[in-house]
Regions:
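Glycine/tyrosine- and acidic-biased, solvent-exposed loop/turn segments at the edges of beta-strands
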Residues: 1-116
């Protein structure tokens, strides 16, 4: 039988899912706060591939991959006030760096696919 994360609920109602001692949940947030803040973790690291890994009820959102701020299809930090910040592998970059990163990645993939 496959190990499933164990749910623990704190006295304030915060829900935590643990697997092997680490915050971990593959099918949803590993931490859910009563105020609707949510955080996604895999093996103890903030991680989510299909959306922000941290969503605050205030509207702020943060994208993480393997514990690092990282997003190649937009800003890694989006704030309620409209401000945005771009990160690649936990390094703050300019928006155009993300655009260039994407072009380079696409070109590389096309090169690999089209090799004979």
């Amino acid at each position: 039988m496959k190990n499933k994360p164990k749910l623990e609920i704190s006295s304030d109602g915060t829900k935590f899912w643990y697997l092997n001692g680490y915050l971990h949940r593959a099918d949803g947030p590993a931490v859910e706060y009563p105020n609707k803040d949510k955080s996604w973790y895999l093996n103890g690291l903030l991680h989510r591939e299909d959306g922000p890994a941290v969503k605050y009820a205030s509207g702020d959102k943060y994208w993480y991959i393997n514990g690092k701020l990282h997003r190649i299809d937009g800003p890694a930090c989006e704030y309620k006030n409209g401000d945005k910040e771009w990160y690649l592998n936990d390094k703050k970059v300019k928006e155009e760096d993300v655009i260039n990163y994407n072009i380079t990645e696409r070109e590389y993939i096309n090169f690999i696919i089209n090799q004979t």
